[in-house]
Amino acid sequence: MSPATESFRMWAEDEKVYGPVDISTLVQWIQDDRVLPETFVQPQSDPCWRRAEDIETLREKFPVAAQVAAAEVGRGASSVAEALHEFPFFAGLTNEGLEQIAALGKAYEVAPGDLIVQQGDACDAVYFVLSGKLRVRLIIGAVDRIDKTLCKLARGEFFGELGMFLQSKRTADVIAETQSRLFRMNTNAFQLLVKQIPELASPVLFNIGATMARRVAEDNQRLYQEVTSQFVWG
C-alpha cells in the first residue's frame, strides 16, 4: 500500500482510538501537536501499534532530533525483544509478540549514579533491567539522611509494576550502580496493550498476577521469620 492511500489509527492520551484517517490528516495532527513523536499509531497495513517516530513515513514529519532518536531505537528493537525472553512477565509469548511489546516501550542507557526513579514520584511506568545492576535505596531522616539499601536489581529483574497498577507514589529511590540498560513501558502504553491487544495482554496480566502473589508470599515469609526470631523459646 502506498503512503498516499495508507490510513492510520491513533491511540490518544485520553486512552481512546481516533481514526482511521489518511496521511494528510495525520500530518496535520502532527503540526497541531495532537500527534507527538511518542504517540502510538497503527498503520492499516501493519497490525502492530508503534510510536509515530518509529514509522518511516511519519518520521520525517518530526524535528531532526526526533528522527535521529527514532532511528537509534529502531536499530535496537530486535535486541530488546530477545532480552525480554528472560522476564516472567512475558513468558509464553512468541517472537512476534515480544517484538510488539518492544515497540510499546523504550530502551535506554543509564550511567553509574544516575537516579532512575525518586521516592515520592508518581508511578507512571514499569522498568525492566536488560543489563547492569541497580540499587533500591531509602533515605531515612530529613537531617541525618541515612542511605539504606533495600535490595539490588540485576539483569532479568523489574520494578514499578505494583505502583503503576495502584497509581501510587514511588516508595524508594532506584539508582544505577553500574552502566545499565533499561526497558521502560509507561502507563499509557500498558493501557494500549490491555485495551487494544488482548491476545498479548491476557498472558502478560496472568504473569503479573503470579509474580505479585509470589512476592507477597515471600514478604510474608520474611516478616514471619523476623517476628519469630525475636522470641527465645524454652
Residue ranges and their predicted role:
Residues M1-L104, E109-P112:
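Protein-protein interaction regions
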Residues S7, K133, Q179-R181:
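Structural motif
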Residues P20, G92, V126-F128, K152, ...:
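Short aromatic/basic micro-patch
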Residues R51, T57-E60, T149-L205:
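Cyclic-nucleotide recognition modules
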Residues V68-E82, G97, R170-T171, N188-T228:
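A small-molecule sensor/coupling module
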Residues G113, D124-G141, R155-G156:
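Glycine- and acidic-residue-biased ligand/ion/polar-headgroup-sensing regions
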Residues I116-D121:
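Short phosphate-coordinating micro-motif centered on Lys-Gly-acidic
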Residues G141-D147:
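Short, solvent-exposed loop/turn segments that connect beta-strands within catalytic domains
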